[in-house]
């Protein structure tokens, strides 16, 4: 209670000098901020490395703090303190102290980002949301109340008890909050749109410590801004997600060796699927070319929400030696639960590695995709020649995912979002260039390689008239500006909403992680 009284006094002082003055970060104040917070909240003061901290009380089996962060870049950050929050009121207290002292902070939801500062922060306050991970089905309302600290595996396993699910991520270890605030592609996007299009209500702590609900009828401008607009408006502590009936699904990974005939068949089949997808919105597809020690391989993920085995729309991906020039290496396709499929994909992204993603979007075209594959192979080989061949965890990946006409129509049916995409532009393909490696000493080689693939791909697409400016926030690198790609009208709207709900720029200036509105 003493701390709350102190905060009230601090707010009175701030109000007297004007509430619209922009805040500026002051890392030198963070020791005082952490001391203030330790009077009321569960706080662990900084050590020399994140692994020096005590175990989070919310983590079972004595897991280390570092295990809460997927990428090595996040694991190695050294915050001034770690704060465990157990309620929205705790979050409000952290924001109040940060605002009063100008100490920057980061919010850890699922901890799956590789962008520095996104979920762990050097010298500032790291807020652990792991305790806010409840998943409650409210069947009569047709929604699930999901804490912002939950991961998708937790959500799916709980809802499967009632044969229900939501539009969410495809890996069990990805956090709910980050994925939804950045848009969120899903196995169900062809029918229901992005994950953000399926949020009924957001529970949000604002910069002034107020707890509000953002919905279509309450704070509707904030509600729309949160649908793909990122973390510039507040800390979301709960998502109320629309639920629907879901039984067993059919799906899995189909793996082929990397050779020209396979590349041609997969890219052409992918583009054909992207055009035909509106005829069967219950299916989803992605493809990826990856490298691990031993060579390259193609993987195609095929999924059917109705549980149909090999639905006709996937005919072009059957094990046809005449088309592919070779047989599949393996297929994991089976009839199973969504959570099991999410577990399988999660195994492809082990924690503790260094990671960097970047992205671009193009009109779906097989010839362009084949060119991008060539650029990717060339840059991976250059990285191997520069010493990455000795890194057993070096795993570059080129991913392609369709943005189909039915997906973009579904987003409008469900109220729309701020990402600026139109169904007339479809089908599009989102390319993700995600490289994983072990050692900081190889950062420059990897980052240069990723940039070269991206630059060559964008240049080729522009030359062919196939470039689209959209950048998917959840795949965008730190030096990319996804919000800039949303279009002038949406950018101006987001600026107005930010000025209305955060006039001092707390979530712009004191939360450095994530993509901001420029």
Swiss-Prot record:
Biological or metabolic pathway of the protein: Secondary metabolite biosynthesis; terpenoid biosynthesis
Glycosylation sites: 61, 163, 208, 216, 346
Alphabetized Pfam families for the sequence: BBE, FAD_binding_4
Domain FAD-binding PCMH-type as annotated: residue spans: 75-246
Molecular function via GO: FAD binding; oxidoreductase activity
GO biological process: terpenoid biosynthetic process
InterPro entries reported for this sequence: BBE, FAD-bd_PCMH, FAD-bd_PCMH-like_sf, FAD-bd_PCMH_sub2, FAD-linked_Oxidoreductase, Oxid_FAD_bind_N
Key word Transmembrane present: no
Domain of life, source organism: Eukaryota
Biological role: FAD-dependent monooxygenase; part of the gene cluster that mediates the biosynthesis of terpestacin. The bifunctional terpene synthase tpcA converts isopentenyl diphosphate (IPP) and dimethylallyl diphosphate (DMAPP) into the sesterterpene preterpestacin I. The C-terminal prenyltransferase (PT) domain of tpcA catalyzes formation of GFPP, whereas the N-terminal terpene cyclase (TC) domain catalyzes the cyclization of GFPP into preterpestacin I.
Assigned protein family: Belongs to the oxygen-dependent FAD-linked oxidoreductase family.
PANTHER family, A to Z: BINDING OXIDOREDUCTASE, PUTATIVE (AFU_ORTHOLOGUE AFUA_1G17690)-RELATED, FAD-BINDING PCMH-TYPE DOMAIN-CONTAINING PROTEIN
This protein's name: FAD-dependent monooxygenase tpcD
Organism expressing this protein natively: Cochliobolus heterostrophus (strain C5 / ATCC 48332 / race O) (Southern corn leaf blight fungus)
């Amino acid at each position: 209670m003493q701390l709350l009284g102190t905060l009230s006094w601090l707010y009175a002082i701030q109000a007297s000098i004007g509430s619209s003055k922009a805040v500026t970060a002051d890392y030198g104040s963070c020791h005082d901020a952490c001391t203030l917070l330790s009077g009321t909240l569960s706080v662990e003061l900084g050590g020399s490395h994140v692994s020096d901290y005590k175990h989070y009380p919310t983590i079972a089996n004595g897991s280390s703090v570092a295990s809460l962060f997927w990428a090595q870049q996040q694991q190695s950050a050294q915050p001034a303190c770690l704060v465990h929050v157990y309620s929205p009121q705790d979050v409000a207290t952290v924001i109040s102290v940060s605002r009063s002292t100008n100490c920057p902070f980061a919010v850890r939801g699922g901890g799956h980002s590789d962008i520095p500062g996104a979920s762990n922060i050097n010298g500032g306050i790291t807020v652990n949301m792991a305790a806010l991970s409840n998943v409650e089905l409210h069947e009569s309302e047709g929604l699930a109340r999901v804490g912002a600290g939950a991961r998708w595996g937790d959500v799916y396993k709980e809802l499967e008890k009632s044969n229900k699910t939501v539009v969410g991520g495809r890996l069990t270890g990805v956090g709910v909050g980050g994925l939804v605030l950045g848009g969120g592609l899903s196995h169900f996007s062809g029918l229901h749109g992005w994950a953000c299009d399926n949020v009924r209500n957001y529970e949000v702590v604002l910069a002034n410590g107020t707890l509000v609900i953002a919905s279509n009828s309450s704070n509707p401008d904030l509600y729309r801004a949160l649908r793909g607009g990122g973390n510039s408006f507040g800390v979301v502590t709960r998502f109320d997600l629309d639920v629907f009936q879901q039984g067993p699904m059919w799906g899995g990974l189909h793996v082929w060796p990397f050779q020209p005939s396979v590349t041609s068949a997969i890219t052409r089949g992918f583009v054909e699927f992207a055009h035909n997808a509106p005829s069967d919105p219950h299916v989803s597809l992605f493809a990826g070319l990856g490298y691990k020690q031993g060579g390259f391989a193609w993987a195609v993920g095929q999924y059917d929400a109705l549980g149909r085995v090999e639905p006709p729309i996937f005919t072009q991906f059957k094990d046809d030696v005449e088309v592919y020039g070779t047989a599949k290496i393996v297929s994991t396709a089976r009839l199973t639960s969504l959570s099991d499929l999410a577990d399988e994909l999660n195994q492809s992204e082990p924690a503790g590695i260094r990671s960097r993603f970047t992205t671009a979007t193009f009109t779906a075209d097989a010839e362009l995709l084949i060119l991008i594959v060539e650029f990717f192979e060339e840059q991976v080989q250059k990285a191997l020649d520069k010493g990455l061949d000795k890194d057993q965890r070096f795993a570059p990946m080129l991913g392609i995912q369709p943005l189909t006409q039915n997906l973009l129509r579904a987003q409008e049916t469900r109220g729309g979002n701020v990402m600026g995409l139109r169904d007339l532009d479809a089908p599009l393909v989102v390319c993700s260039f995600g490289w994983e490696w072990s050692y900081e000493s190889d950062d420059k080689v990897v980052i240069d390689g990723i940039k070269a693939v991206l630059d060559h791909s964008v240049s080729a697409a522009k030359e062919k008239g196939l470039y689209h400016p959209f950048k998917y926030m959840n795949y965008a690198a730190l030096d990319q500006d996804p919000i800039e790609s949303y279009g002038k009208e949406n950018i101006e709207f987001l600026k107005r909403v930010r000025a209305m709900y955060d006039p001092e720029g707390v979530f712009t200036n004191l939360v450095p992680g994530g993509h901001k509105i420029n």
